[in-house]
Amino acid sequence: MRRAKIVCTLGPATDSYDQIKDLVDAGMDVARFNLSHGSHAEHEERYHRVRKAADETGHSVGILADLQGPKIRLGHFTEGPVLLERGDTFTITVEEGIEGDRNTCGTTYAGLATDVTPGEHILVDDGKVCLEVTDIDGPRVHTTVIEGGVISDHKGLNLPGVAVSVPALSKKDEDDLRWALRTGADVIALSFVRTGRDIQDVHRIMDEEGRRLPVIAKIEKPQAVENIEEIVAAFDAIMIARGDLGVEMPLEHVPIVQKRAIKLAKRNAKPVIVATQMLDSMIDNARPTRAEASDVANAVIDGTDAVMLSGETSVGKHAIETVHTMARIVEAAEEDILAKGLPPLTERNKPRTQSGAVARAAAEMGDFLGARFLVAFTQSGDTARRLSRYRSPIPLLAFTPDQATRSQLSLTWGVETFLGPYADSTDAMVDQVDELLLKYGRCRKGDTVVITAGSPPGVSGSTNLVRVHHIGEDDSPK
């Protein structure tokens, strides 16, 4: 059983129902809707196809709505793409209605002329083109081309080292967020997060819509790296978005940031996703490079909850095979991890709350007793996430009465979910475990399972119960 989860970005290469179903069969745990592209109508069609494929295959598949964020972009070029060569001069203006040409182009960012200073760099299209600011004349930013290349309509701009004065949510993001909440998305990702406070506007809109969902902070700005501890505390999960991060800060720092962020998220029982260019060569090729295979494996060994595919599945020529390949790499990496048994407690990973201590006790009891499964009864998902944090080699099953919680746990390492009725007592939990695990052939009579839950149910952080049970036997206290 593969433990780390796979997130797949949907797009033109995976738009049909059959293609989406094939992704689920290949190992997709979460479908990502990149709201930087496509209309609400297009994404809504994908939404229904994902739900249908999940129902027909019996797999739990979460839906992640990824907000574009306040992405800074160039404007429109009247005559198409423009080639800039080293030493050329080029002007970017914040004036409205400017059509781009060989010498000048507009931008979506009204604050550009006030935020940059001479000597700073502006990177275009993920760093493919580099411009150095030479002068600022009112709304016009004059630059010299340091590294040339082709630029075209709406290419992204990065301003490394510049604290840009943009809001956490753009008007488009707010519209997209309301659409995602009303449509039924399971998780929201917020782009270009800088501080823990950036979640506040998202929560305000969620409260207005009457639906609170987990929010993922995308770590892709140097400010986010500086504030990583408060971001992990404030948000429900993090995504290490290595594309923009590798443009905004020196490339050699990105692997260190990735490892640090994974450790911090695990310590706080928050899911973490590693994203961008994981199997990038498979957009065109049927096999990944050895370096890409090592990249995926090392993210798994570091302890990531999930690995993400972007262009590989949205526009790639080998989308389905890419997911199969990623699943095989993950499973191979996990063989060595799981063979080492339950990781020992250290000062870094020891529990710091009652719920964490109870979850650790359940994991250790399962290890000592040779349990067939660890079982978490959960309404909010918190109990399952706390158990997952300890990376026990014993398979972890989460029983929940809430479909949304089931879908949200699709991001959490090692969790396999069952949807069942609300259990209002430990005896009801035991009965449900017996019924479902025997029904699906997952256990034999007499197998040991360790059950943990929270009381009162549905309250995050209330995990306080552990019970050892032998399947099909009456071992309740007399």
Model-derived features: positions:
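Non-catalytic helical/linker scaffolds that mediate oligomerization, partner binding
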Residues: 1-478
